[in-house]
A protein has these predicted regions:
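Generic C-terminal helix-cap and adjacent flexible tail
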Residues: 119-134
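A conserved short alpha-helix in the GNAT/GCN5 acetyltransferase fold that borders
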Residues: 35, 44-52, 75
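Conserved GNAT acetyl-CoA-binding A-motif
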Residues: 51-65, 73
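Acetyl-CoA-dependent GNAT
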Residues: 1-35, 41-45, 118-119
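Conserved active-site alpha-helix within GNAT-family acetyltransferase domains
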Residues: 41, 65-104
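Short hydrophobic/aromatic beta-strand or adjacent loop that forms the aromatic wall/cage
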Residues: 1-3, 109-114
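Short glycine-rich hinge loops at helix-strand junctions in the catalytic core
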Residues: 38, 55, 78
Length: 134
C-alpha cells in the first residue's frame, strides 16, 4: 500500500491510501479531519496524477450502500457507479456479526457499490496544493 498525506502546518488533516495492480488503482482509504475544505479533492487529484504516472487506465473505490457522502463526493469528482454487489455485506455479516446492520443516516447496510473513474491524460479538474507521498 502507498498513499498521500495532506498537511496544514504541522497537522496531518487528510490521508489517502491506494494499491496498484494490473487492473489499475484501487483507493483503499480517503479520510479528512476537516470537511468542505478541498482536502479530499486535493488528495484525489494526487492519486489521479500517480495513477497516470504508473500507466493506470482507471481508479476505483468500493464502499457500502449507506455511505452516501462517500458516493456523493466520488460522483462529484467524476467517478461513476460501475457495479453493485447485492447482499455481499449481509453475507459477510453471517461470518462477522459485528458488522453493523444500519449505517449513516439510518440506512440499512446490505450492498457494496463500486465507483470507477477512467483516467484521461492531463485531466486536471480538482486543483491541488500538493501532498506528501507516504
Amino acid at each position: 500500500e502507498e498513499g498521500f498525506l495532506e498537511r496544514r502546518g504541522n497537522d496531518i488533516v487528510g490521508l489517502l491510501t491506494y494499491h496498484i495492480d494490473e487492473r489499475g488503482m484501487e483507493v483503499l482509504t480517503l479520510n479528512s479531519t476537516l470537511e468542505g475544505q478541498g482536502i479530499g479533492s486535493s488528495l484525489m487529484l494526487s492519486a489521479i496524477d500517480r495513477a497516470r504516472e504508473r500507466g493506470c487506465e482507471k481508479i476505483w473505490i468500493t464502499t457500502t450502500n449507506d455511505r452516501l457522502r462517500v458516493i456523493d463526493f466520488h460522483q462529484r469528482v467524476g467517478f461513476r457507479m460501475m457495479k453493485i454487489n447485492l447482499g455481499v455485506v449481509d453475507e459477510a455479516r453471517a461470518i462477522k456479526p459485528q458488522i453493523p446492520l444500519v449505517g449513516e443516516r439510518g440506512v440499512p447496510i446490505h450492498d457494496e457499490i463500486v465507483l470507477e473513474l477512467e483516467i484521461e491524460p492531463y485531466l486536471d479538474t480538482l486543483g491541488s496544493e500538493g501532498n506528501d507521498s507516504v
